[in-house]
Design a protein with these regions (language model features):
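A short local loop/turn or secondary-structure capping micro-motif enriched for an aromatic residue
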Residues: 20-30, 157-161, 218-221
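Generic N-terminal segment detector
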Residues: 1-72, 77, 275-279
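Residue-level marker for the onset of beta-strands and adjacent loop->beta junctions
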Residues: 8, 136-138, 261
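Short acidic-glycine loop/turn motifs at beta-strand connectors
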Residues: 7-8, 13-17, 142-147, 204-207, ...
């Protein structure tokens, strides 16, 4: 099942049919068994598919209500190595090696819902940063009880130059206007997402590809319920929350984003999250 939040309402897509759901987003998705809950709406009259296609193509919003977005870091070996490389001159590389092997994961706050960009929107790079990358990440929707209910694609925009200068600058490297995008929908399977699921990214500059890559979830060191458990250990989220789970796709050190770049993040079952870097 795919659940879209659009300008004209909530649209559920399953088995080639689309259904309108008249409900607030928060109450709709914060369910103890979201897949079963959504299945109840498939007994209604399906939407005209051309109208549903138009609503999704022209009016898709970020699949978030009032939830917070959090993020996990250094969950893939590639990410650990990249963080160590960018911070070696400041002496911070030790911390990334240590957190990769530690029981406790790196978790940090990413964005409030009003700062989240949807597919088709613009993400930003900081004016005081010299080295910037997108981070394509499977993102979990976790209900208020701490159970993973759905998945979406996320882009954790990051300043490698600022974080590399000093690990304590991570909030500035990660949290700013236009630094977080989610979409295009919530993927709600009836079972946990497969560890063989592939995450892909392509970046185009003036129509030419400048970076592409893909990785499977089974390359992640941490388990998804493990990350959710740590986040909920001493935190409560009344309407649930979103958790980005880290990236294993890191461009080479010679690469940095530029205004006008088009970033496309694709995850099997979810679709494509596409954003343009703002001028």
């Amino acid at each position: 099942m795919q659940l879209f939040k659009t300008k004209t309402g909530n649209i559920l897509r399953t088995e080639g049919k689309s259904f309108h759901i008249d409900s607030s987003w928060d109450s709709l998705i914060n369910q103890p068994d979201l897949h079963q809950h959504l299945s109840g709406f498939t007994k209604g009259t399906p939407l005209n598919e051309s109208e549903a296609d138009l609503a999704i193509a022209n009016g898709t919003l970020p699949p978030i209500g009032t939830q917070e977005v959090w993020a996990a870091g250094v969950t893939y070996l590639k990410s650990r190595d990249a963080r160590m490389e960018e911070s070696k001159d400041s002496g911070g590389d030790f911390f990334y090696r240590k957190v990769y092997d530690a029981d406790r994961p790196e978790l940090f706050f990413k964005a409030l819902s009003h700062r989240v960009v949807g597919t088709g929107g613009q993400v930003r790079i900081r004016k005081d940063s010299k080295w910037d990358v997108p981070e394509p990440e499977l993102t979990l929707f976790i209900d208020s009880k701490g159970s993973i209910q759905a998945y979406t694609a996320g882009n954790d925009m990051s300043s490698r130059s600022i974080e590399g200068e000093n690990p304590l600058y991570l909030p500035q490297a990660k949290m700013y206007e236009g630094s977080c995008s989610l979409g295009p929908c919530l993927f709600v399977p009836g079972h946990p997402i497969s560890t063989e699921t592939k995450i892909s990214i392509t970046i185009h500059r003036k129509t030419k590809p400048v970076f592409d890559g893909n990785i499977q979830l089974n390359r992640m060191k941490r388990q998804l319920p493990e990350l959710a458990g740590w986040l909920f250990k001493e935190m409560k989220f009344e309407n649930g929350c979103f958790l980005m789970t880290g990236t294993g796709l890191v461009p080479g050190n010679e690469f940095t984003l530029q205004p006008g770049d088009v970033i496309a993040i694709s995850i099997e079952g979810i679709g494509v999250l596409r954003n343009v870097v703002a001028s």
